[in-house]
Curated annotation (Swiss-Prot):
This is Diterpene cyclase DtcycA. Homodimer. It comes from Streptomyces sp. Keywords: Lyase, Magnesium, Metal-binding. Its cofactor is Mg(2+). Diterpene cyclases that can form multiple diterpene products. Belongs to the terpene synthase family. Its EC number is 4.2.3.148, 4.2.3.149. The gene is dtcycA.
Length: 371
């Protein structure tokens, strides 16, 4: 029940373009229940307070919206659900590191052991690991069993990149200078797991895209654009979440660390103007993805067509997940419906501005059009 002393925050998000239908996987309850069992087994729900934090991640519902196709293998969906429960916790811990005086030594040591477990789970005796690292061992072993060596290698590479990007983000915000949106965006493309999600989507998709197609610049541009749409959704909804948290007495660091807040601090404008700018970036990126997708369809293999269909579902499902997930409506796990989001979903067609790159580090995506 919502704390009566807390007035719900009304947070309006500008119109967001999404031409894809919404759906949810029929096994959503199973994914959630088994995911919570996984986290409980590995010691993350030892107290009621811990259990509330984990449950609030809502990973089962997120995965069910990302991948609604009932034909997707449930064991793969479950592995991704368990992965999200654990790694959302790790992702949230970066803010504690940013606000501490310990620097990067702790995260580097933690990430190094994680990477070794992901790379060679069979080289470690599970019974000799603590519960936390047993969870990593479990995920790494299941991933290797459930997919091809090629897909597993792609996943490991992306996990490595995600860890390195988290270290870069921690270092960026631990510096004393004012962080600029232009610095933050290229790092956030990786830390929000956009590139990791490219390979997670490939893991879920039963077909394996041939290497020459997979590594083509146009396919990578389309995949990165699709997942960056999810990045912008995250930044828009996280802006509301962070605004609510900063209004609480327990808020730590009040420096902006979200794309919306960074743009607002950089321009001196209003929150509404910064939200509108990020929403426009997002909508233009949707349009870029659609244009690249249309061009790829002409020569795509059946496996690539299946993968593009997965991307469509993730774009739509991610928007729905943010609009419904307790992770965003209940920021601390103790105040259900603390934030009342009012998003506007539209299927209106793209504007001409959609063909203009939005930032130099990702301009190469637009360069793949008509190539």
């Amino acid at each position: 029940m919502t704390d009566p002393a807390v007035t719900p925050l009304a947070f309006s998000i500008p119109q967001l373009y999404c031409p894809f239908p919404t759906a949810i996987h029929p096994e959503v309850d199973t994914l959630t229940r088994a995911g919570m069992d996984f986290m409980t087994h590995h010691g993350f729900c030892n107290t009621e307070a811990d259990r509330l934090v984990v449950a609030n991640i809502d990973a089962g519902a997120i995965v069910a919206r990302w991948y609604p196709n009932p034909d997707f293998p449930v064991d793969r969906l479950q592995m991704v659900t368990d992965f999200l429960y654990l790694y959302f916790l790790i992702d949230d811990l970066r803010f504690e590191v940013i606000n501490s005086d310990t620097g990067l030594a702790g995260p580097i040591a933690l990430f190094a052991q994680h990477l070794d477990l992901w790379e060679y789970p069979q080289a470690h005796r599970r019974e000799e690991l603590d519960l936390f690292h047993q969870a990593i061992h479990d995920l790494a072993s299941r991933m290797a069993e459930l997919t091809t060596p090629t897909k597993a290698a792609r996943m490991r590479r992306s996990i490595n990149g995600w860890f390195l990007a988290l270290l870069r983000e921690i270092a960026l915000f631990n510096d004393d200078h004012a962080v600029m949106a232009e610095e933050y965006l290229p790092i956030r493309v990786v830390t929000v797991a956009s590139r990791l999600m490219i390979d997670v989507n490939g893991f879920i998709c039963p077909a394996e895209v041939p290497g020459d197609e997979w590594y083509s610049l146009k396919v990578q541009a389309a995949a990165e654009a699709a997942m960056s749409v999810c990045l912008y959704d995250n930044e828009l909804y996280s802006a509301g979440k962070e605004q609510w948290l900063k209004s609480r007495a327990t808020a730590h660091d009040r420096r902006p660390r979200n794309l919306v807040a960074l743009i607002q601090a950089q321009t001196g404008g209003s929150t509404e103007h910064a939200l509108q700018e990020v929403a426009e970036y997002r909508n233009r990126t949707v349009c870029l993805y659609l244009n690249l997708r249309s061009q790829l369809e002409k020569t795509a293999s059946p496996a690539l067509l299946a993968y593009l269909s997965v991307l469509d579902g993730v774009i739509s499902g991610n928007l729905d997940a943010h609009a419904t997930s307790s992770r965003y409506h209940n920021p601390d796990g103790h105040h259900p419906h603390a934030i009342a989001f009012t998003p506007l979903r539209t299927t209106d067609e793209c504007s001409a501005r959609a063909h203009t790159p939005i930032a130099p580090p990702i301009a190469w995506w637009w360069e793949q059009l008509d190539q």
